[in-house]
């Protein structure tokens, strides 16, 4: 029985069977890499050519032009601004400039007077002490004649005396309403007057004598005004009567007006040697101290402020 079998291909092809071989490829690596790169470039070009519809639009940026360089001003001299100029002035220079402006423009001077705070007792006495230090610094060393010394210290001496004359009315009523402030200033100013130079010549002593006279009248005015407030009780409780008696003794009795004002109001220190006449007149029933209705006796007896009887009962 003849059976026809289909011929089966051999698992190992013959080397001469060229029809079944794969196409021949280039063995050059350079050619292979070039073809691959070209394909990649073609794919990228296709992707970039197709823009998605949902892609956001890139905003266009405006490039700012570089600003022109500002040309620096050439160096030249110019005066200082007013705030810088005032920083360079000390107290004396600033006071001099302000004083000249006020003298040239009286309306500005009046505004300064109205706007400036009132001087305190401490500031006024501090200025007097500054003038006093200048006077001491002008006194020559060693033994010198009286005339030479006087003319050497005349200018600071006059400046101190004038300062006392200018400051004293500022602390007197009705400008100064506080009696204690007035008394404190007069106490300090009197101490300054005590230390003024003593001269042998009467012509040179007139400055100190005039200063004592002015201070004495100022004491009298303040004492009289204080006696109208509470019977002048502040004069005794503050020890001002004894203080005035010591000043009068140190001045050589040149505060007579002040002592008379203190005695006439019934307030004077009992330990002072300058009140012996006043004490004697009080014990004899004469003067203000001997009056039973005086404020001093009423305060001592405890009857000050009691109601006064009116009528026959």
From Swiss-Prot:
Keywords: Cytoplasm, Nucleus, Protein transport, Transport. One of its GO terms (biological process) is metaphase/anaphase transition of mitotic cell cycle. PANTHER family: FI02826P. Residues 269-285 have a biased composition (Low complexity). It is found in: Cytoplasm; Nucleus. This is Tethering factor for nuclear proteasome STS1. One of its GO terms (molecular function) is proteasome binding. GO terms for cellular component: cytoplasm; nuclear envelope; nuclear membrane; nucleus.
């Amino acid at each position: 029985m003849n059976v026809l079998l289909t011929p089966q291909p051999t698992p190992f092809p013959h080397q001469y069977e060229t029809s079944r071989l794969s196409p021949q490829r280039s063995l050059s690596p350079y050619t292979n890499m070039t073809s691959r790169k070209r394909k990649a470039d073609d794919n990228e070009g296709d992707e970039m050519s197709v823009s998605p519809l949902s892609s956001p639009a890139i905003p266009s940026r405006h490039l700012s032009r570089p600003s022109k360089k500002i040309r620096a001003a050439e160096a030249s001299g110019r005066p200082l601004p007013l705030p810088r100029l005032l920083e360079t002035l000390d107290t004396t220079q600033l006071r001099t400039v302000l004083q000249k402006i006020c003298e040239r423009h009286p309306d500005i001077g009046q505004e300064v007077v109205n706007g400036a705070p009132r001087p305190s007792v401490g500031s006024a006495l501090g200025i007097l002490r500054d003038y006093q230090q200048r006077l001491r610094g002008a006194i020559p060393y060693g033994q010198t004649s009286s005339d030479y010394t006087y003319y050497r210290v005349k200018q600071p001496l006059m400046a101190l005396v004038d300062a006392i004359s200018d400051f004293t009315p500022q602390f007197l009523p009705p400008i100064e309403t506080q009696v204690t402030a007035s008394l404190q200033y007069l106490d300090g100013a009197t101490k300054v007057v005590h230390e003024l130079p003593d001269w042998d010549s009467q012509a040179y002593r007139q400055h100190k004598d005039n200063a004592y006279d002015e201070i004495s009248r100022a004491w009298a005015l303040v004492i009289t005004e204080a006696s109208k407030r509470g019977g002048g009780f502040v004069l005794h409780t503050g020890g001002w009567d004894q203080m005035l008696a010591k000043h009068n003794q140190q001045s050589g009795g040149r505060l007579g007006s002040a002592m008379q004002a203190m005695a006439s109001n019934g307030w004077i220190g009992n330990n002072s040697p300058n009140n012996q006449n006043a004490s004697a007149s009080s014990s004899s029933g004469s003067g203000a101290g001997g009056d039973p209705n005086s404020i001093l006796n009423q305060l001592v007896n405890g009857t000050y402020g009691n109601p006064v009887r009116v009528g026959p009962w």
